[in-house]
Amino acid sequence: MEALTPRQTVRELDKYIVGQEKAKKAVAVALRNRYRRSKLKEDLIDEVVPKNILMIGPTGVGKTEIARRLAKLVKAPFVKIEATKFTEVGYVGRDVESMVRDLVETSIRMLKQEKVEEVEERAKRLADERIIELLAPYPNRPTQTKNPFEMLFGGVQDTQQEDKSWEQQNSRIKFERETLREKMSRCELEKDYLEIEVEDQSTPMLEVFSNSGVEEMGVNMQDVLGSIFPRKKRKRKVTVEEARKILTQQEAQKLIDMDELTAQAVKRAEDHGIIFLDEIDKIATREGTTGSADVSRGGVQRDILPIVEGSTVMTKYGPVKTDHILFIAAGAFHIAKPSDLIPELQGRFPIRVELESLSRSDFEQILTEPQNSLIKQYTELLGTEGLKIEFSKNSLVEIADIAYTVNEQNENIGARRLHTILEKLLEDVSFEAPELNGQSLTIDSDYVREKLKDVVTNRDLSRYIL
């Protein structure tokens, strides 16, 4: 894990997310505290638990993106879960422990990818050798067992001749392999075909079973059945280029110690994992209501509580402690309030950050400032058709103003409004782009107003289209 200072973390997040300084600072400090904890003495490490964060703010202002970018920044296992997907224990649906299992799966996948990259060069060399062997296989050595009568009537001479012939073939194959290696180094064999053996991924009778019934045990039925019914191998005819990819994966798998990888991945999930609980306001029990749905919501909160507090969850990779996993909960809290969550759960999210609604200037910055801004994305997309597209400064101001106005008049969906507006604005250009190869188009404020005037002025129409 990279040891970034809070200021460095905020600076990195600024490359992708506009505004929301309070939220960025909160997650940056939480991240730095993990690094500080790792420097403590053994007797104190277990005592220091992460301070979980509750983000409050409307949709589309950057709650999820802040958490996702943070995890990517430090290469930490990250899962985003919607709290509304969970049901109480005993009811049909996903149980809350599944989020910890998902986190471990993510950690295994991440670490496996890292290990594969580490051994990739070696695996490629081994794969190339296997390709050479398949293209020019050595002949089988002639059997030495002979009939006793043959030994009496010149059988020894025949055997010597066969051995000599086999040695000659071997010499020829060695020379052929050297020639193939030279051709391979010059990439002259890439389009040649050969047959390789691959594992058949299908498992017999898997459709009879359902993973959901055994999910709470942390058991994958495909793995269980895979050990009962060994996977069959089948032959595939592929090019040398494709064969190299397949065989490199196979060789990389052999070079990786999966037991060691699993132990490291579980440890990484426990110490550095981030679980993002979205829509947590939807499971809050509102004051003065006592319906069956509210009882269910309260039950889900009580089920989440021990995991956030710190408990041990059984997975197919072994027990996983949740004591030091960072939980970031988020919700709009339009109807419910944070105080509508059960008191015990409120206490487990001591850091509360309110994210602000986006202003006109925020929308303008979102269009151009982030590293992979929306304007850059659309410009590059249409550029693949040979169409050069440019947005003038006043067109960006106009687009930002329309996004802000429509959000104020209708549902406030934050920065996502820009996606719908840009899609509508560039609808005709995207359709005609293949016929405009080699041309240039400048989009100014007049063009924006012309394309969007009907939608913006008609409130009912904007509600459906934008």
Curated annotation (Swiss-Prot):
Stored InterPro entries: AAA+_ATPase (IPR003593), ATP-dep_Clp_protease_ClpX (IPR050052), ATPase_AAA_core (IPR003959), Clp_ATPase_C (IPR019489), HslU (IPR004491), P-loop_NTPase (IPR027417)
GO biological process, one term: protein unfolding
Disulphide bond pairs: none
Binding site for ATP: V18, G60, V61, G62, K63, T64, E65, D278, E344, R416
GO molecular function, one term: proteasome-activating activity
UniProt GO cellular component terms: HslUV protease complex
Superkingdom assignment: Bacteria
Location of this chain's protein in the cell: Cytoplasm
Main location group: cytoplasm
Coiled-coil boundaries: none
Name of a matching Pfam family: AAA_2
UniProt keywords, alphabetically: ATP-binding, Chaperone, Cytoplasm, Nucleotide-binding, Stress response
Function: ATPase subunit of a proteasome-like degradation complex; this subunit has chaperone activity. The binding of ATP and its subsequent hydrolysis by HslU are essential for unfolding of protein substrates subsequently hydrolyzed by HslV. HslU recognizes the N-terminal part of its protein substrates and unfolds these before they are guided to HslV for hydrolysis.
Stated family: Belongs to the ClpX chaperone family. HslU subfamily.
Quaternary data: A double ring-shaped homohexamer of HslV is capped on each side by a ring-shaped HslU homohexamer. The assembly of the HslU/HslV complex is dependent on binding of ATP.
Full protein name: ATP-dependent protease ATPase subunit HslU
